[in-house]
Regions:
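Proline/serine/threonine-rich low-complexity linkers at boundaries of modular beta-sandwich domains
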Residues: 29, 55-63, 152-160
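Exposed beta-strand and adjacent loop surfaces of beta-rich binding modules
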Residues: 96-100, 140, 194-198, 241
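Cysteine-rich modules of extracellular adhesion/ECM and protease-associated proteins
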Residues: 6-60
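Surface-exposed interaction/gating patches
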Residues: 77-92, 148-211
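Short, recurring structural edge motifs at helix starts
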Residues: 33-39, 70-71, 86-89, 186
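A cross-kingdom feature marking solvent-exposed beta-strand/loop segments within repeated
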Residues: 66-71, 78-87, 93-98, 102-131, ...
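Proline-enriched interdomain boundary motifs that mark the N-terminal boundary
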Residues: 62-68, 162-166
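Terminal connector regions
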Residues: 117-118, 131-172, 210-211, 228-259
Length: 259
């Protein structure tokens, strides 16, 4: 074999090895992967779906939470805020959603409160914050959803919490202007460490007059528990309707256990 031909063959081999090495380095360090923070390769989302083991939970089939109109109520020289929050997704909910309630006088923020809420699939519940101090009299409030992770609902059973024997009325005695009496029945097969109860008082037009929230601890399966809401000082308007909603966070495994 001629010397020149041999040099060409050797050079070709070196080039092939170099090109192969570069391609391998690119595939390992720069090519599409399930950890590069980009939607590429066979992925259906960013580092999820398709060739990646992680499922895409934030796909287009999931809808954002729907926020209703915000009610601001002055009570005892402070301010309460209430609105309905709806999750219209059928299989996914939130074990925890962080939010901020901001109260404004004109464009100036004069009060705020941060909190957390949970929502099951296809659920509407109240978001309530009470006793917010403000630097000036607010004329509006806004609620900002800050963070939260979708969780697939895999429980066999939703909470079955029933409100029984609800009654309400004006007492107009010292320390008790208005009260609501009720019973909470746990028809679920689970015992709950905590059951959350929301109360919203409205007039005949549907305007929110007063709100409150509370919780019951250690509510056993099959148990019926008495409870009372009361407002020690007067609020404006004539109460005609009281909405009571009870719920418990089944996304939190520490909150429930079966019989």
């Amino acid at each position: 074999m001629k010397r020149k031909t041999k040099q060409i063959i050797i050079t070709s081999i070196y080039l092939a090895v170099a090109i192969g090495s570069c391609y391998l380095v690119y595939k390992v360090f720069f090519g599409p992967s399930c950890h590069d923070g980009r939607q590429n390769g066979m992925e259906k989302g960013i580092d999820c779906g398709g060739s990646c083991p992680q499922q895409c939970l934030n796909g287009p089939e999931l809808k954002n939470l729907q926020l209703g109109s915000v009610s601001v109520i002055e009570y005892k020289e402070r301010f309460d805020v209430a609105l309905e929050v709806t999750n219209i997704n059928g299989q996914f909910g939130f074990g925890e959603v962080a939010y901020e309630v901001a109260l404004y006088s004109g464009e100036e923020k004069v009060g705020r409160r941060e909190g957390k809420i949970y929502l099951l699939p296809n659920e509407t519940r109240y978001l309530i914050e009470t006793g917010i101090e403000c630097q000036a009299f607010p004329d509006k409030a806004k609620v900002y959803i800050q963070s939260g992770e979708w969780q697939e609902f895999t429980k066999e059973e939703r909470p079955k919490l029933e409100i029984l024997n609800k009654s309400f009325g004006y007492k107009k005695v010292a320390g008790n202007f208005f009260e609501v009496n009720l019973q909470v029945a746990n028809r679920s097969s689970y015992d709950f460490l905590t059951v959350d109860i929301d109360a919203v008082v409205k007039d005949k037009s549907g305007k929110v007059l007063a709100v409150s929230k509370a919780n019951l601890n250690s509510v056993k399966s099959g148990e019926v528990r008495d409870f009372r809401f009361f407002w020690p000082e007067a609020f404006e308007g004539q109460a005609q309707l009281v909405e009571i909603k009870a719920q418990s966070n089944v996304f939190d495994l520490k909150n429930l256990y079966s019989k």
